[in-house]
Amino acid sequence: MPSKNASSTASLDTSSKEPTVDPATCTHQYEEKVTRKPRVLDVGEKTFTCKFCNTSYIEEIAKTNTIKILAVGNSLTSNATQYLWEIITSAGVPKENVTIGRLFLPGCSIAWHWSNIEDFKEDYDYSKNTNGSWLTQQNFSVQAALEDEEWDYIIIQETIASVTNPTAYSHLGDLILYLMTAEPEAELAWQLIWTYQAETTSQWCKFKTPAETEEHFGKIVSTYKSQVQHWSQIDHLIPAGTAVQNLRSSYIGDTITSDGIHVNDKHGMYITALTWYAALAGGDLEAVTWLPSRYPDLADDLPVIRQSVKDAMKEPFVITQQAK
């Protein structure tokens, strides 16, 4: 991880705890705790609290210099990261300071990832973006991808086929422990995925009505709460699925996938990458200026896309109605 140097600027505060020593006469001995981790576009904070009188003060932690993200997933993580490099760099992060990596195995679940790790399987396509283009290598293992960079963030998710099945998460603890051991300085994140598109002729179409898709998304959320949320080692939630559901409630409608499940390369890949940016980079959504060159008209929809992401970050477990 990049160096996280605290600034010298401090602001005084008084703890709500009952002091055991008069702060005016106390010979302070402060204990330090990071209360907000810095990100590439957002400063962090350290809180120093006196163990005798509970007086505290806050110091700012400088932004990190680089951001390196590794997604261990399947086609939905590939969808969500397709535009991520462009979005982060357009917000002002130097291009040479952004690295996006992803391990791709179609339909790969948490249990399957864990089995591949145990058996040192080299079954993945490993794609990496350091300059705006994806370079893909085949026959890669999870171990090799972890060793390729000193990753700042590692993202995991469950596959759509088993995302609502509680038994599918039986090896989540094993996977978390392995990743933390392999990359102890990295922060873990979980992508909350989206559900199927309704009323399509696609082979992926599981539901006939929007009400059925909303019900399924509710099950995705409830399963996350029961099977994932209690893992304190997961530092971040990326509510990409919530952002997609929010956008589906807008005038754009349920037209965001290319085949009933994989998001399309217009609204779909854009809103999911923007959600990753919001969750991991910490920058303002309005600072993102990049648009896919083949979709200049996407600029007209940026207000509702941004609002869908903002609402997802604020209320990740609730579908927020957008402008019709």
Which role does the model predict for each range below?
Residues 2-21, 324:
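Viral virion structural and adsorption modules
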Residues 13, 17-63:
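Extracellular modular ligand-binding repeats in secreted and cell-surface proteins
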Residues 65, 256, 260-263, 267-324:
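Conserved catalytic region of serine esterases and O-acyltransferases that act on ester linkages
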Residues 70-72, 103, 191:
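Short hydrophobic segments within beta-strands
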Residues 78-171:
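Conserved SGNH/GDSL esterase-like catalytic core that processes O-acyl groups on lipids
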